[in-house]
Amino acid sequence: MNSIRNFFKTFLLVELVKGLMVTGRYFFARKITVQFPEEKTPISPRFRGLHAQRRYANGEERCIACKLCEAVCPAMAISIESEQREDGTRRTSRYDIDLTKCIFCGFCEEACPVDAIVETHIFEYHGEKRGDLYYTKPMLLAIGDKYEAEIAANKAADAKYR
């Protein structure tokens, strides 16, 4: 009896028809493709994109050169050099992030005691050469200055979860 059933399943191509029914169901279903450059999907408030360095309201940079972000970075993408000022405080003389190494884990942002380094919502950046993805301190400060309002709003919205 089993051999007769297997013969009819094979002869009538039951498995093929079942597969085509599944394909047909998805063929006529509503499409969910997003046409990327024109349409954009919403971004989570906790999205980790391009890095930025922040300043205080008086214009002074926030980074105190504690080097916690450099120490906690698992990809070793951050390199910092610091120097003493005349008033005895320590500030960065060089702060570089190599985005070809960075894995955007957010550890640097979590480790920073003064919220100097943050990750923005910017994900549309590119480089023609490898060196274009090597961000220096002036570049990071410029990004922070440009997007400070958005960064502050995201920090305030996320404050109760930190």
Swiss-Prot record:
InterPro entries: 4Fe4S_Fe-S-bd, 4Fe4S_Fe_S_CS, NADH_quinone_OxRdtase_chainI. Its EC number is 7.1.1.-. The gene is nuoI. NDH-1 is composed of 14 different subunits. Subunits NuoA, H, J, K, L, M, N constitute the membrane sector of the complex. Belongs to the complex I 23 kDa subunit family. Its main location: membrane. It is found in: Cell inner membrane. Its cofactor is [4Fe-4S] cluster. GO terms for cellular component: plasma membrane. It is a peripheral membrane protein. GO terms for biological process: aerobic respiration. Keywords: 4Fe-4S, Cell inner membrane, Cell membrane, Iron, Iron-sulfur, Membrane, Metal-binding, NAD, Quinone, Repeat, Translocase, Ubiquinone. Gene3D superfamilies: 3.30.70.3270. Disulfide bonds: none annotated. It comes from Chromobacterium violaceum (strain ATCC 12472 / DSM 30191 / JCM 1249 / CCUG 213 / NBRC 12614 / NCIMB 9131 / NCTC 9757 / MK). This is NADH-quinone oxidoreductase subunit I. Binds 2 [4Fe-4S] clusters per subunit. It catalyses: a quinone + NADH + 5 H(+)(in) = a quinol + NAD(+) + 4 H(+)(out). Residues 53-83, 93-122 form the 4Fe-4S ferredoxin-type domain.
